Amino acid sequence: MELLFEIGMEEIPARFLNQALEDLKSNFEKKLKNNRIKFDGVRTYGTPRRLVLVADEVAGMQEDLDELSIGPSRERAYKDGALTKAGEGFLKAHRIEEEQIEIIKNDKGEYIAFKRFLKGKPTEAILPEILKALVLEETFQKSMRWSTKTIRFARPIEWFLALYGGKVIDFEIEGIKSSNKSKGHRFFGKEFEVSSVENYLKKIRENNVIIDISERRKMIEEMINNSLLEDEKADVDKALLDEVTNLVEHPFAIVGTFSEEFLEVPQEVLIISMKVHQRYFPILNKKGKLLPKFIVIRNGIDFSENVKKGNEKVLSARLADARFFYYEDLKIPLDNNVEKLKTVVFQKDLGTIYNKVKRCEKIAEFLVGKLKYNYMKEDILRTVKLAKADLVSNMINEKEFTKLQGFMGENYALKAGEEIGVALGIKEHYYPRFQGDLLPSGIEGIIAGISDRIDTLVGCFGVGVIPTGSKDPFALRRTALGIVNIIINANLDISLKDLVKVSLDALEEDKVLKTDRAKVETDVLDFLKQRIINVFTDMKYRKDVILAVLDKDSDNITTALEIVKVITEKLSKDKMQALLQVVKRVSNIMKGNKDVTIKEKLFKTDIEKTLYAESKKVESEVEQAIKEKEYADYFEKLFTLVPTIDKYFETVIVMDEDKNVRDNRIGQLTYIMNLFEKIAYLNKLD
């Protein structure tokens, strides 16, 4: 038989709906299984005003329970005819008396046991408690009590519709009784009786409620597209579409307009006002320029001039505020804002944003020299100085436009006559803001972005603010990933150790370090290494290749990536496979030996002498290849040793009876192994 359960309530926040339905479904399925009630499937529907659950083919009876619980052995359960603690524990666990115990025999001996048989009950007798529990156990990010009730829910509950096989499942929670009645749209529907799931689905639609979330979303998308002229497009992102879908029971799209005067303000400001503050969809032309139009999705079934005018009025007030803040900000020089950063706390132990900017300037100056951008030093340091200036602007500071940090800084900088690269760098130093985001394109934004992130990362580690499990209040994992991705994208030749050290120097000058400097350095570098592993893994490189390279040296990200690429390309070659076989064999013989003392007078065979001469020649060649960053050539040089090493193993017994000869041969192989491991631990490759 089919089951229908609807929790009717005052409108809950849109962000609560999907999780509430997911929890309702999983909890119901769990309870049916725990109660031995078979069912075919469970599906959910939802609007801000109702959570709906439908279950198909729910069995009319519980299954009988016939189980045997085996406890400890008879020997452990009894001593001198009396129960031991083990025996008493078995009784307690099963809530039974000693008389209910049986002794059973199996291949392992005699054991105490308890046989239980429970006759299944009618499902309709069990469902009331199950449905009550579903309501009482439903949790939300925030919940409330109302009236004199003790129950907590996202919003006050108004009704329960509960049917099983067409009959009402009777239950009550603090005066709210279940029934066969539901309610339609708050303004365009009425109360109605329900006799079945099919009947409910028909009547709920007749009462202007679209309970299927995916159907509502599709309707909204179609309505938006149908509202556009040929040369227009709407700014529709998934998050806003999902939110609006969960704000209405029946969508209807209305096109509104606003004064063209507001287009003087950067369109990103207007778009934020519409999307974030009002949940409207902005309309743009095909080139991406904002038009003085928007789409609002009303919770209704038809056009309303009053709704249109009301939304236009609200938006105009919003945009007027934004325009006022914008022009007020243009009156204030950005340098003045830098001074105001002294009043904004970055982190309680690390000082203000102003302190942070000063540290970033020192890091940036180091990077300018290291990366040989001295000819752009003035613009780069100017970018770093102004990077956070917009945080204290009217537009950003407590004015609900925080998403525009960086963008507004760029705009104000351009209006103030700053260099284009400086302005762009102010915006781009925040890139990437999330996974898959843009990366800074100019060196100003690249250096400002790295300086900002390494100061945050090292600073937080330096005062003991370190991510643990799911807790990462300063988003340090994302910060470290940003450093790694910026360096890779810009192909920067830089030592992470040097970068961390210069950041530590700046923190020490500010006298804010609370943790041992050496420990901070080690911990930060390990943290960065793990992020490098993550990024390389996302790039689809083999884990063993990544670790072979990074366990050898993770200090220079671009160098490490180049080596990973070369090894990956070489792995498909027969020469590389032959080299790896030799590496494994040499590694097994060495067994961790580090001594490379070699005495030529102890060579007893010509092949030992030949291998030594060839390896000395290859050593100088591979060192030159590494110096020139020709890593493919490095491996080509190693390949030349393989035939000689193979011949060596065919004719030489390394474990000679003479200890001096044996040690000399192991030393020679250790020397060769060092050649193999100059840029990666090849013996770690599968």
Swiss-Prot record:
Subcellular location: Cytoplasm
Aminoacyl-tRNA synthetase in keyword set: yes
PROSITE patterns: AA_TRNA_LIGASE_II_GLYAB
Any one of the GO BP annotations: arginyl-tRNA aminoacylation
Catalytic function, reaction form: tRNA(Gly) + glycine + ATP = glycyl-tRNA(Gly) + AMP + diphosphate
Pfam families registered for this protein in UniProt: DALR_1, tRNA_synt_2f
Superkingdom: Bacteria
Leading EC class: ligase
InterPro entries: DALR_anticod-bd, Gly-tRNA-synth_bsu, Gly-tRNA-synth_heterodimer
UniProt EC number: 6.1.1.14
Subunit architecture: Tetramer of two alpha and two beta subunits.
Similarity comment: Belongs to the class-II aminoacyl-tRNA synthetase family.
Protein name as it appears in the record: Glycine--tRNA ligase beta subunit
Organism of this sequence: Fusobacterium nucleatum subsp. nucleatum (strain ATCC 25586 / DSM 15643 / BCRC 10681 / CIP 101130 / JCM 8532 / KCTC 2640 / LMG 13131 / VPI 4355)
